Regions:
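Active-/binding-site microenvironments in catalytic and ligand-binding cores
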Residues: 1-165
């Protein structure tokens, strides 16, 4: 990782929000397609929370792997692109993977897609999102996951995290 000065260029909120996209990619790869859908997100300063669908409680080892994989992707300096597309074109090109459980209103006809490209050029994460994002994962800093909360009755996994420095 680089010195802490590099991270001060971008607001904590932007770094933390961008981290959500990196963590989501890791969650899908570690926990599988059952955790594809985001139910909610939260960011405040250097703290964030990602809530995803999850059919079964993950093991401690799986949570550790999500953190490890997320930080690996940060160190790989993955490129992040925001692309504006018509909703129809975005849905035709990428399907419903661009959406979360909370719907985009039907009157929205143009979407901003945030694409995190993996080191091999494939898509690590893609999502319709109108927030500000970093140009690269290297500016995020280190992700430290906190104790997750599995809500069995709703089949949801809440993953709180902090971004350091």
């Amino acid at each position: 990782m680089s010195s802490g000065l590099e991270y001060q260029v971008f607001p904590d909120e932007v770094r933390t929000h961008t981290a959500l996209h990196v963590i989501k990619g890791a969650v899908i790869r570690v926990l599988g397609e059952g955790s594809l859908w985001t139910a909610s997100t939260y960011t405040s300063g250097k703290h964030g929370r990602l809530t995803v669908t999850c059919p079964v409680k993950p093991s401690n080892e799986q949570i550790e792997e999500i953190e490890k994989l997320s930080n690996k992707k940060i160190s790989e300096d993955l490129r992040i692109v925001s692309k504006t597309m018509s909703r129809a074109e975005a849905e035709k090109t990428y399907g419903n993977i661009i959406y979360d459980l909370f719907p985009v209103p039907p009157e929205v006809k143009e979407l901003i897609l945030v694409i995190v490209y993996d080191i091999d050029g494939s898509i690590w994460n893609i999502n319709a999102c109108n927030k500000t994002h970093l140009p690269s994962t290297r500016f995020i800093g280190e992700i430290k996951l906190e104790k997750p909360r599995f809500r069995a009755s709703k089949k949801l996994l809440e993953i709180p995290f902090n971004v350091n420095p």
